[in-house]
Amino acid sequence: MCSDEVRMFAFTELLERCPYPSMKTASIGLFKNQINGAFNSKKDRPPSVFASPVIVDKFFPILFRTSKKWCTEEDTFWDDYSYQMQALNLYLFLLICDKSENRTTVFDQEKQVWMNNEYIHHLEVTIDTIMERHKKDSNDSDEQQSGIRLMNLEMMKNVIEQIKQRMTLSV
């Protein structure tokens, strides 16, 4: 088994430089597994970097990005949808598993303000814009596809609502 630092480097490379979107998406799940392992490890071991502020400080700016193209070029949003859902689920997971100790600083006020202002707010605006467009175009010949997309947007909104309920901010 390699050290935490080596694994952190590998995740940084995967999330920042990997040219394959599906691999980036899958790496979020692997990253979450590492975090889960760190939180479940015995207390007598040295603390893992996977249960430390490094998660929020180094990886949040890498993981939680939005695109201005999403509202105007909807296909770009759908290309990123799986990644964004994985990222949102990772954030929700951190809010759940780090609630008692705040080892990652995920509950620090400035971190939550950043998350809301830089990511969640933009994602909500995008979701609302796309939903409105699909509701208007629901009579299209692509009605089934539109319905599936509306359902996916509702699922994303649901995860965001769960996140907001767990955040200590009043957003």
Regions found by a protein language model. Name each.
Residues 121-171:
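Eukaryote-biased recognition of C-terminal alpha-helical segments
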Residues 4-107:
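Long alpha-helical HEAT/HEAT-like repeat alpha-solenoid scaffolds in very large eukaryotic proteins
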Residues 1, 65-82, 132-150:
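Acidic, Ser/Thr- and Gly/Pro-rich intrinsically disordered linkers and low-complexity segments
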Residues 34, 84-86, 109-112, 144-145, ...:
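Residue-identity detector for glutamine
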